[in-house]
A protein has these predicted regions:
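Active-site loop-to-helix "anion-binding N-cap" substructures in soluble metabolic enzymes
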Residues: 1-239, 246, 250-261, 265-348
């Protein structure tokens, strides 16, 4: 059901957002976890890697980022000359909160022979302390390019790091963070659903705990889950990630049934991200009208955080198991001096 689009004392929100977008030469980027009404008016809807690429390439003057704070910060870092607005600056992330920069810095200093492979769900300050940033859709391709004998710190998501360790036979040191949304999925409720829909595959995000992943037929990023759900021959798909992605599934494959795996005891909305939900059409309208709140970061911080992000963008096109594309990352001392460039991906 589509939410009402008129409020703020009768303002036609869709019409005004469209007008302001043109007037401001703005682009609206939205994550798959946003409410359907925001996804439907966005210029681009995608996962963190998709949206990072769009932010880096846009010729718009203003980026209206409908997501959470670390995503908007990433857009600002990659497009420092753009005005980046976030409808609600309180839209944070439990993973970001779990990894304070001073503690992450101390963790790095205690393990000087390790490079830091860091999940994008972190603050700009933690990115600046990292060697390479990854998203859930690029992590496997990037890890595949790092020599097996290179010691690695991975954070802040311990479940994604554990999944990568198991899949690649690695022994990365893991920061103990979790996503509160994916942590809430219930193994008991998942098994009930599997019994209710025999043969229906489970598509799970690697931020889920191992007991959810082990019952899943497919594990991948939001974009990979979406692709699987649309292309699968199965007519019923069980989805173990934030349920607002189901909106895109239903638009692309309306003849199929997509069922979100419950959290907790099955009677709560604890698998919906409370931070993503803070963004609304009303707040987006006000942000475009006032160009506030803006993401503002110190130039030196953006410069330091941009290097590991650029490595991610350069390395993300590698095909796992097909050999290195360009030079692999070698060791932490070369990364720290900035003498190793990320591989150049053909066609990008």
């Amino acid at each position: 059901m589509t939410a009402p689009t008129t409020s703020l004392k009768g303002v036609d929100l869709l019409a005004e957002i469209t007008r302001l977008k043109t007037e401001r030469n703005a682009v609206i980027l939205a994550h798959y976890y946003q409410k359907p009404e925001i996804q439907d008016l966005a210029d681009f809807v995608g996962d963190s890697l998709d949206l990072s690429r769009k932010a880096a390439a846009t010729d718009a003057d203003v980026i209206a980022f409908c997501g959470v704070r670390f995503m908007a910060e990433t857009a600002k870092i990659l497009s420092p000359d753009k005005t980046v607005i976030l409808p609600d600056m309180d839209a944070g992330c439990s993973l970001e909160d779990s990894c304070p920069p001073d503690q992450f810095k101390a963790f790095r200093e205690a393990n000087p022979d390790h490079i830091a492979l860091t999940y994008i769900n972190c603050s700009a300050a933690v990115k600046a302390l990292s060697d390479i940033i990854v998203t859930s859709s690029s992590a496997e391709a990037i890890l595949d390019q790092i020599p097996a004998d290179q010691k690695i710190i991975f954070g802040p998501d311990r479940h994604l790091g554990g999944y990568l360790n198991r899949k690649f036979g690695r022994d990365m040191l893991l920061w103990p963070g979790i996503c509160i949304v994916h942590q809430a999925f219930s193994e008991t409720e998942l098994l009930k659903l599997k019994a209710q829909y025999p043969g229906a595959p489970v598509a799970a995000h690697p931020e889920c705990p191992p007991q959810i992943v082990e019952h899943s037929e497919m594990v991948g990023s939001t974009s990979a889950i979406l692709k699987f759900a649309i292309e699968s021959e199965h007519q019923v798909i069980l989805v173990a990630t934030e349920p607002h992605i189901i909106h895109q599934m239903e638009k692309a494959a309306p003849h199929k049934t997509f069922i979100g795996v419950p959290g907790g005891d099955g009677n709560c909305n604890c698998n919906m991200c409370p931070y993503m939900a803070l963004n609304t059409l009303e707040k987006l309208y006000v942000a475009l009208r006032d160009l506030r709140p803006q993401v503002e970061l110190a130039p030196a911080l953006m410069d330091a955080a941009r290097l590991p992000l650029q490595r991610m963008l350069d390395m993300a096109g590698h095909t796992v198991g097909k050999g290195d594309v360009g030079r692999p990352i070698l060791k932490s001392d070369e990364l720290d001096t900035g003498t190793i460039e990320g591989p150049q991906v053909p066609g990008e």
